[in-house]
Amino acid sequence: MGNLFCCVQVDQSTVAIKEQFGKYRDVLEPGCHCVPWFLGSQLAGHLSLRVQQLDVRCETKTKDNVFVNVVASIQYRALADKANEAFYKLSNTKGQIQAYVFDVIRASVPKLNLDDVFEQKNEIAKSVEEELEKAMSAYGYEIVQTLIVDIVPDEHVKRAMNEINAAARLRVAANEKAEAEKILQIKRAEGEAESKYLSGLGIARQRQAIVDGLRDSVLGFSVNVPGTTAKDVMDMVLVTQYFDTMKEIGAASKSSAVFIPHGPGAVKNVAQQIRDGLLQASVGH
């Protein structure tokens, strides 16, 4: 019906190309327009002004001879004031953009090692965008944004990279574990040293108390029982301690202590050895 009355509708964010007898005449903005077909006017086609996206996958090789697939995402749109150029100058817009992307990526990536490609992907995207902007502006197109969205190495290389990463993490974990064990051993040794020191203090105080008690016992017994000597008192004390020791050993069900020599006569020998040691020490001085 619109063609019958020579009226055409152009949608929003779209322009129409008007021709007369096959020659470009005008760009029709969104709205209703009169196109008198009987005077040779017609619509050659429509051109969208919306932002479009094209994903380009490019296979190339890095400087260290690793094959990678670089995926670039190109966002572009036709310029309203250059709609006639965008419509007539390019027959395959996506193919043209793809060709420029291939050219820039395959010129940039081979100069970089694989790790540098990942680190400098923004610089690669900027180079692609600058080259596309310079080339496509002559055809009535604007490059809105260019992104390197993915860098995919060869499967074998990817597996090797994962193994290297895993090995590095295991090495760090092993170092941390060894450091923790080292600290634990140091703390354990410090604890044992402190324990032995305190135990030594306790034993020293215990022996001092025993000596003080024996001295008081000998002096008290000698005073209260006339005619007894210090030797007699010491023999009695040693016998008493002997029986106390044997009692404690027998009372413990799981005792691993063995009292040698175990006979009562051994107390006399012990006492004699102590006296001989004291006499020898006195003579030495």
Swiss-Prot record:
Q: Which residue numbers carry lipidation of type N-myristoyl glycine?
A: G2
The record ties this protein, via InterPro entries, to: Band7/mec-2_domain, Band_7, Band_7/SPFH_dom_sf
UniProt xrefs under CDD domains:
SPFH_like_u4
Keywords for the protein's UniProt record, in alphabetical order: Coiled coil, Lipoprotein, Myristate
Query: What's the reported outcome of changing G2A?
Result: Loss of hypersensitive cell death induction
> What is this protein for, i.e. what is its function?
Positive regulator of hypersensitive response (HR)-like cell death. May be involved in potassium ion channel regulation.
What is the name of this protein?
Hypersensitive-induced reaction 1 protein
